[in-house]
Design a protein with these regions (language model features):
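Bacterial N-terminal signal peptides that target proteins for export
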Residues: 2-11
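Bacterial signal peptide processing site
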Residues: 25-27
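Surface-exposed substrate-engagement region within the catalytic domains
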Residues: 217-335
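Substrate-binding cleft of extracellular glycoside hydrolase catalytic domains
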Residues: 117-119, 126-205
Length: 338
């Protein structure tokens, strides 16, 4: 950690697109007469499969946009009808967050208490529990390919999924790319993201490709084009697997962590949360939220609370649910504890 660190109708649409493609491919082959009068069969025109797929995706996206305009969201969307409260970390690490720092049973008891506090603080909005697991983690060592990141083992991922299912919680898989990039890392999670209860987080702090530095030495950055890649990646999974919308979380605690935010292109198949990720005293945290989230809105907002770092110096304290609900505008729909 850097010391300054203070997402039915779509299925029908897909079938329509597939049917149109099938009809085109099954048309009789045209023929023409040769100079001798015999028929010469023309070879079938080559099909640009990538173009066809893009057209189908565009058709599906337009259908999604139409539904969203009429109803405000797609069927099965979690936001804004819930407040997500998450425990963050890695079950194999005591140093990455509350998820993994304490024995499982002890952590789950604490989680139940936190969930109850949030539900009591705002009875009007149901609380959705979540585990937010760092699944691809930035590393201090380069690794075999020099990219400074490591993916959790399958057994770790499956155990984390099991923990989430025990709590009827959704699961976020968080990605720290190091010197790699999203196009190389996100496809590794495709099979997991086909699960409707699994969502995605991306962390610009550890995106170092444009910084030419090892993770932890500088604060990394993403541009709108990187966020758009993640949105499109998730939207494709939603469409191809007939899923409810996915949630994408983008962490942020400095101006430079996200550039050109106005160029982010929202898609109704993906619900985007900008998560204010800094630690420190409540005044600093609220100021950072105002500067980097409230003043640069994208869609939905999130706020992180640190069990250790927010109380590091007296009289600092861990903000209560009531404080978060009454002192932040817009009120976060995602609250994360690390």
């Amino acid at each position: 950690m850097v010391s300054s660190k203070v997402f039915g109708p779509l299925a029908a649409c897909a079938l329509l697109a597939a049917g149109a493609l099938s009809a085109c491919q099954n048309r009789p082959i045209e023929s023409e007469k040769s100079a001798t009068g015999s028929s010469v069969v023309k070879p079938p025109a080559a099909i640009d499969t990538l173009k066809v797929k893009r057209l189908a995706m565009q058709h599906d996206s337009l259908k999604a946009d139409s539904i969203a305009r009429k109803t405000g969201q797609l069927p099965g969307a979690l936001l804004p009808g819930h407040r997500i409260v998450a425990f963050y970390g890695n079950i194999r690490s005591k140093g990455m967050g509350i998820l993994g720092r304490e024995p499982k049973a002890q952590m789950m008891r604490k989680f139940d208490k936190v969930l109850a506090e949030w539900q009591a603080a705002d009875p009007s909005l149901p609380v959705m529990p979540a585990l937010h697991s760092v699944t691809i983690t930035a590393q201090g060592a380069a690794g075999a390919d020099g990219k400074y990141r490591l993916m959790n083992s399958k057994s770790t991922i499956e155990e984390t999924r099991a923990w989430a299912k025990e709590k009827n919680a959704i699961l976020f898989m968080d990605v720290q790319v190091g010197l790699s990039d999203l196009p190389h890392e996100l496809p590794k999670l495709t099979e997991y993201l086909k699960d409707p209860t699994i969502h995605l987080g991306i962390d610009p702090e550890f995106a170092m490709a444009t910084k030419n530095a090892r993770p932890g030495k500088k604060i990394g950055t993403y541009d709108a084009k990187d966020v758009n890649y993640a949105i499109n990646f998730l939207a494709r999974i939603v469409s191809e697997n007939h899923l409810p919308p996915k949630i994408l979380i983008v962490h942020r605690f400095t101006q430079g962590m996200l550039t050109n935010y106005k160029n982010i292109k929202l898609d109704p198949r993906v619900q985007l949360i900008m998560d204010m990720d800094g630690w420190g005293d409540p005044v600093l945290k609220k100021d950072s939220y105002k500067a980097y989230v409230q003043k640069q809105p994208v869609q939905y907002t999130g706020f992180k609370l640190f069990y250790e770092y927010d109380i590091k110096r007296k009289p600092f304290h861990l903000m209560t649910p009531k404080e978060v609900l009454t002192e932040l505008t817009p009120v976060p729909l995602y609250v994360q504890y690390q």
